[in-house]
Amino acid sequence: MRMSAPELIRIVSRDSPMALAQVERVRAELAALHPGVRTEVVPVRTTGDKWLGDLSQVEGKGAFTKEVDAALLSGEADLAVHCVKDVPADRPLPAGTVFAAFLKRDDVRDALVHPDGLTLDELPDGTRVGTSSVRRVAQLAATHPHLRCVPFRGNANRRLAKLAAGEADALLLAVSGLERIGRTDVISEVLSTETMMPPIGAGILALQCREGDRALIEAVSALGDPRTHREATAERMFLHVLQGHCNSPIAGHAQVDRSGELSLRACVFTPDGKVRLNAHEWAGRLDPATLGTSVAVALLRQGAREIIDGIAH
């Protein structure tokens, strides 16, 4: 027997412009599916948004989810919207909560933003590239060692403002994030996943509920995309088995092809980019979680544990 959807759904999210744009997508999809349901937004400022230093000094990736989770668990909100890449995979979700749906995946690629429209290969020696992502820093060090990465934290709008103020010469940002805030006009070049392997969970929004809210879970689960669910499951299990931390340069991309076959390509780097471990497997008869485990084990056999444990965090 189908349960009726709740009359009101309070949606909690980070209060950045990008996060609130993501909430509007969720509200629109809910309205299309359940026209009679009202929604309210509960914006919260997270530790990760307030702290612009090294994330390892606060709570790593959990710095972007702690306050959102607290609002959900306290009953202040009913539904949380997360970027999957910001949700720690080295630990379970907070007790009493579940992911009810993964929305259809957006673009996973990174973009270069340069005021004069230069491409990555056109950047001259010593160009200051703004990014605080250890994943991006390691890959740039490996392929473009003549560039200089400078720490750049803050939401996308803030980073664009800092670029305009001359604090860097170029920026690396997620294509999906620029799409969400309507700023694709600043993109100089979209980087292929071969040039810049994306982070785990790139371009995926997850809807999180309290596990006892069965009517709400049923109402929002229909927003989920089956292909994205398979990809997210493989990627998050991969990261869970690796037990990476926020200073670990780890990248990975699971993909369901047109025939429905799932594969996972992943890498672990040293921070200086001088060592890169690679693994790429097709699921075949394996379920997504088992594929993620298999790829992680393949990298562990190559020495990933020693690299990860050797990085301060």
Curated annotation (Swiss-Prot):
Catalytic activity: 4 porphobilinogen + H2O = hydroxymethylbilane + 4 NH4(+)
PROSITE patterns linked: PORPHOBILINOGEN_DEAM
The protein's annotated pathway: Porphyrin-containing compound metabolism; protoporphyrin-IX biosynthesis; coproporphyrinogen-III from 5-aminolevulinate: step 2/4
First-level EC class: transferase
Presence of keyword tRNA-binding: no
InterPro entries membership: HemC, Porphobilin_deaminase_cofac_BS, Porphobilin_deaminase_N, Porphobilinogen_deaminase_C, Porphobilinogen_deaminase_C_sf
Cofactor: dipyrromethane
GO (cellular component) term, any one: cytoplasm
Keywords: Porphyrin biosynthesis, Transferase
Disulphides: none
EC numbers for this chain: 2.5.1.61
Cofactor binding note of this UniProt entry: Binds 1 dipyrromethane group covalently.
Positions carrying S-(dipyrrolylmethanemethyl)cysteine: 246
GO MF assignments: hydroxymethylbilane synthase activity
Gene Ontology biological process terms from the UniProt entry: heme biosynthetic process; protoporphyrinogen IX biosynthetic process
Other remarks in the entry: The porphobilinogen subunits are added to the dipyrromethane group.
Protein family (similarity comment): Belongs to the HMBS family.
Function: Tetrapolymerization of the monopyrrole PBG into the hydroxymethylbilane pre-uroporphyrinogen in several discrete steps.
Xref: PANTHER family: PORPHOBILINOGEN DEAMINASE
Summary of subunit composition and partner proteins: Monomer.
Designated name of the protein: Porphobilinogen deaminase 2
Gene transcribed to yield this protein: hemC2
